[in-house]
Every structure is written in C-alpha cells, then in structure tokens.
Amino acid sequence: MRGNIHVKTNIIVFAFKGQLDAFSEKQFKNFITNNLKNEFSFVIDLTKIDFLDSSGLGALVQTAKECKKLKLGFSVVGNSRVAQTIKLVRLGDFLNLKSSLEDALNYLKN
C-alpha cells in the first residue's frame, strides 16, 4: 500500500493505492496518526484500493473514532468494491462514506 497527501481548501486528502488489509494496517495507521496533529478535517480516498479486509475496516473505524474524539471532520471515498464492503457491514454512515472526492469535500465544508 502506498499513500500520498494533498490539501484542498483546508481539508487534507489522503489517497491510498494497493490493499488495505492485515499486512498494511499498521502502515495505514502510522500514516494517519502522524498527520492527525494538523487539526484539519480530512478525507481518506480509497478509490485506488484493490482490496479491503476486516483489518482494514477496523483501521478505518479506529480512525473515525479518533477523529470524533479530536472533533475533526472525516469522510471516506471508495470505489465500488470498497463501498460495497463498507456497506455490507453497515459502516457507511459511521465512516461518512461518499461516492466521490467532490461529495466528500462538500460534506466536510458544511
């Protein structure tokens, strides 16, 4: 899994490629944790993730909880496979799942 960061109107966008699974979960958590200090709302863009398993879902849930605790806005964008997995376990609302980066950015601006 690889990730990069860019900022759009005071919202940090974390874009990831590859797989978010048991093998990459620690890397994902470290990447996010190191950037939570910025105190900006953020989007996790998973549109280029090929595979998401229960460990990846757990990392997303933990990230959402941490954001709520810090009062940071948070949203997830996923491709159809990622969205299907998130919806299957009924985490769409909790993770503020959006269908596009534009929708996620608009959600966080309001």
Walk through the language-model features, giving the residues of each.
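A short, charged, amphipathic alpha-helix used as a generic interaction element across diverse proteins
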Residues: L108-N110
